[in-house]
Amino acid sequence: MSITTIIGPMFSGKTTEFIRLIERKKIAGKKCLIIKNYRDIRYDSDDNDKYHVTTHNNIIYRNCDIMFTDNLNKTSLIDTFQEKYDVIGIEEGFFFEGVTDFSNELANRGMEVIISTLESSYKQEIFSEIGKLIAISEDVIKLKAICMGCKISDASFTIRTIESDEKILVGGIDKYQSVCRKCLNLHKRKNTLSTESEQINNQTELSEPTRQKESLKIKKRRIDS
């Protein structure tokens, strides 16, 4: 039938839009299922109360069948869904390996697929799986947040505010912010200066002439940039 993909940075309202589209299908009499990943437990208070979708501003949606999995590479799942549901919603699609092929097969079998997902990492590197998904989607809805830096401009990017090199780190406002391009560049500049300061501090083990030489190099890079 079709694939609709909702993308945008964190805090841009992707889950709110996702819930809105699912609820419209419910009102139209469609049988709907939402798939969540086991890793996404940010707003689950306990194991007995996890079968819901929750937005960042704590709107809770339960008016739909919900299942948890971390593996979409099962033909049996698609066969079961085809028999029971008209609409399949996938929350936080970037968590799932194979989400593109899975969604494509569902759509080819006559189901509607609605996916909410980040399209890129905190380093502004696109998730390759989501790039493929966008290419085969009939509809792509790109949302923007409000910049948490200047609190004026629209935000199209997500930055991580804690030190971690993990590509995917589950979290909310405690670990991430949405920012505009200007604030993104300020953030990158701040991180660069922090790294350079660490390099200068690490030069205490070098000889005095070598330390002065390295310090001059770093200062020159700052001036040139």
Swiss-Prot record:
Chain spans, region Disordered: 197-225
A Pfam match: TK
Translocase keyword on record: no
Bias-annotated ranges (Basic and acidic residues): 208-225
GO MF entries: ATP binding; metal ion binding; thymidine kinase activity
Keyword Transmembrane: no
Protein's GO biological process: DNA biosynthetic process; thymidine metabolic process
Residues that hold substrate according to the record: Y122, K167, I168, L169, V170, G171
Enzyme nomenclature, EC number: 2.7.1.21
Keywords of the record: ATP-binding, DNA synthesis, Kinase, Metal-binding, Nucleotide-binding, Transferase, Zinc
Binding site for Zn(2+): C147, C150, C180, C183
Positions contributing to ATP binding: G8, P9, M10, F11, S12, G13, K14, T15
Chemical reaction(s) catalysed: thymidine + ATP = dTMP + ADP + H(+)
Gene3D superfamilies: 3.30.60.20, P-loop containing nucleotide triphosphate hydrolases (3.40.50.300)
Active site as annotated: E92
Amino acid composition bias (Polar residues), ranges on this chain: 197-207
Annotated PANTHER family: THYMIDINE KINASE, THYMIDINE KINASE, CYTOSOLIC
Family as reported in the entry's similarity comment: Belongs to the thymidine kinase family.
Protein name: Thymidine kinase
Species per Swiss-Prot/TrEMBL record: Acanthamoeba polyphaga mimivirus (APMV)
Taxonomic placement: Viruses, Varidnaviria, Bamfordvirae, Nucleocytoviricota, Megaviricetes
